[in-house]
Amino acid sequence: IHQEVIPAIGCTEPVAVALAAAKAAEVLGHRPEKIEVLLSANILKNAMGVGIPGTGMVGLPIAVALGTLIGKSAYGLEVLRDLTPEALAEGKQVIEDKRIHIALKDNVDKLYIEVICSAGDETSRVIICHEHTNVVYVEKNGVVLTDRRKEGVSCDASGDEDELRLSFSTVYEFAMEMPLDEIRFILETADLNRKAAEASLKGNFGHTVSKTVSGVYGRKYMGDSAYTHMLAMTAAACDARMDGAMIPVMSNSGSGNQGIAATLPVLSFAEDIECTEELLIRALMLSHLMVIYIKQSLGRLSALCG
């Protein structure tokens, strides 16, 4: 849970690319003059049409540019949280100067990101694969600094999924039987994702599904029930993050939408039936672990975003 359920700002595919770009720029030690980005088909597809937090723009070029300009790899999936208007203007200039080249890389893991930065005679190269924050290879000027591929971390199309194999019974027993104080931390997911939903309702993000569902026509045709409450709260948080709002959410298995879907329907229903805190904690833990369990079979990157 601690490994898979972490905060993220923005859609995790372009943010993961920004993370690789930030790491490559840090290793280079200079502002890159050229940036080459090689991506798996799923990363390329999932990142093409979503909003980048705080920019009002969509797609990979601005994510890559900002990653090299203001990104800090230590921030993980919150790599772009130091964005300023000045940095955004610089990022737009990098795109206009055509310093970024993005291409498809075949026969690699579904989640594969490679960024090569250069300035003068110096170069750096960073590879993320299998997981959104999993840096497996770092190189500077032809010298390998890190190569976790030698440790059995595969980045080809046949790479194995997580070594830990969960079962339904294991997940259920853990959620139902663990001492409450040891799993109470899962309430952080409810707190963060609820704030994202509430912030979304103060603006007009994405398709404004939440406002439609809870508005006059939504209530007329869909009713006012526990189901519509769950739908409205969940859609609010998803709309905001997919539209590029600077709102952090708690992700699951590298997906903000999966983290939201594992959290907010449970929280909304718990509030509707006024259940105990213990029941909410155990339900949230079961929900998040079930997502991780299911992703073992589906793979970390699905055909659709989230």
Say what each PLM segment does.
Residues 25, 269-282, 292-306:
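Hydrophobic alpha-helical bundle architecture
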Residues 11-18, 53-68, 253-263, 305-306:
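FAD-binding core of FAD-dependent oxidoreductases
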Residues 18-117:
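Early transmembrane hairpin of solute transport permeases
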Residues 2-11, 45-55, 245-255, 296-305:
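A short glycine/serine-rich beta->alpha loop
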Residues 96-244:
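Signature of multi-pass transmembrane helix bundles
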Residues 14-30, 257-275:
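Alpha-helical support elements that line or immediately flank enzyme active sites
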Residues 1-14, 19, 92-96:
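Short, Gly/Pro- and small/polar-rich lid/capping loops
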Residues 29-43, 225-244, 276-295:
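Acidic-glycine-rich active-site phosphate/pyrophosphate-binding loop
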